A protein has these predicted regions:
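Short glycine- and Lys/Arg-enriched binding-loop motifs that mark or flank ligand-binding interfaces
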Residues: 110, 160, 172
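Glycine-rich, aromatic-flanked loop segments that form ligand/cofactor-binding clefts
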Residues: 152-166
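A charged N-terminal "starter" segment
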Residues: 1-156
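Active-site loop/helix belt of alpha/beta enzymes
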Residues: 1-3, 147, 163-174
């Protein structure tokens, strides 16, 4: 899939009447003066356009789920935008679970990933209705089963299977 935006700059980038660079109607000099630098400025129009491009690229495959990797940038604003575009979320912590929840995400479209998940994180995931939990080892599976039973919930899981090949990674996913 080729991006429709072949430029590095956001779609709404322009030079305004003051001669300053502007993105999404915001004068970047003014933002820098108000918030300091470095400063990350995202363009909602560009983000939404990219989301639509991805959805269009995969529309021939209706069972495809678009997932935003929250570890890239997990804020209320980005989560709300991605959710409103119909994306699910790949989250790796309680903070990310809570952020996408507060942003109004459809929690059934959330996948809780990551190794060494704590009992508190698994409990939060179950209580907030996370759609699937990726399980990395037998200990985590037993812990999740215990927590799910105590909440009288059935949890959809994805099992990470390792074929016994040494890859020198985190001990919890060996």
């Amino acid at each position: 899939m080729n991006s429709t935006n072949q430029s590095l700059k956001p779609l709404t980038t322009k030079i305004n009447e003051a001669g300053n660079l502007e993105i999404g109607g915001c004068d970047l000099i003014g933002l820098a003066e108000k918030y300091g630098t470095p400063l990350y400025v995202l363009d909602e129009e560009t983000i939404r356009k990219i989301c639509k491009d991805y959805k269009n690229a995969f529309k021939a495959y209706p069972k495809t789920n678009m997932m935003y990797a929250s570890k890239a940038l997990c804020t209320m604003a980005t989560s709300a935008i991605m959710s409103s575009e119909g994306f699910g979320f790949d989250v790796v912590s309680a903070g990310e679970i809570y952020t996408v929840y507060k942003a109004g995400a459809d929690m059934s479209k959330v996948l809780f990933n990551g190794n060494n998940k704590s009992a508190d994180e698994l409990t939060l995931a179950i209580e907030l209705g996370v759609g699937r939990i990726s399980v990395d080892n037998f200990f985590e599976l037993a812990l999740l089963n215990e927590i799910a039973k105590s909440h009288k919930k059935v949890v959809d899981v994805l099992l990470r299977i390792t074929p016994g090949i040494e890859c020198h990674t985190h001990e919890y996913i060996q």
